[in-house]
């Protein structure tokens, strides 16, 4: 394990602690999930380079695609939530019914 791996693991742990302690704002949750998935993708790519295997790089590409779709859907939900309630709070998601 080298220094870059340790830094990425530390960033991932910081992101998980951010999810645990900050559950009210949906924008912060989206940013933290992007951070976590980005670090996981980088860890997969670094592991594939160290092991000389292509599957880690493909997994990193899949994670990158998934995070792009997640952010697009999440931002669409945020826009709809703000237009309906005027507040971006996770507790107001039940007001988006039908």
Swiss-Prot record:
This is NADH-ubiquinone oxidoreductase chain 4L. GO terms for cellular component: mitochondrial membrane; NADH dehydrogenase complex. GO terms for molecular function: NADH dehydrogenase (ubiquinone) activity. It is found in: Mitochondrion membrane. It is a multi-pass membrane protein. It catalyses: a ubiquinone + NADH + 5 H(+)(in) = a ubiquinol + NAD(+) + 4 H(+)(out). Keywords: Electron transport, Membrane, Mitochondrion, NAD, Respiratory chain, Translocase, Transmembrane, Transmembrane helix, Transport, Ubiquinone. It is an enzyme of class 7 (translocase). Core subunit of the mitochondrial membrane respiratory chain NADH dehydrogenase (Complex I) that is believed to belong to the minimal assembly required for catalysis. Complex I functions in the transfer of electrons from NADH to the respiratory chain. The immediate electron acceptor for the enzyme is believed to be ubiquinone. GO terms for biological process: ATP synthesis coupled electron transport. Its main location: mitochondrion. Belongs to the complex I subunit 4L family. Pfam families: Oxidored_q2 (PF00420). InterPro entries: NADH_UbQ_OxRdtase_chain4L/K, NUOK/Mnh_C1-like. Its EC number is 7.1.1.2. The chain crosses the membrane at residues 1-21, 26-46, 61-81.
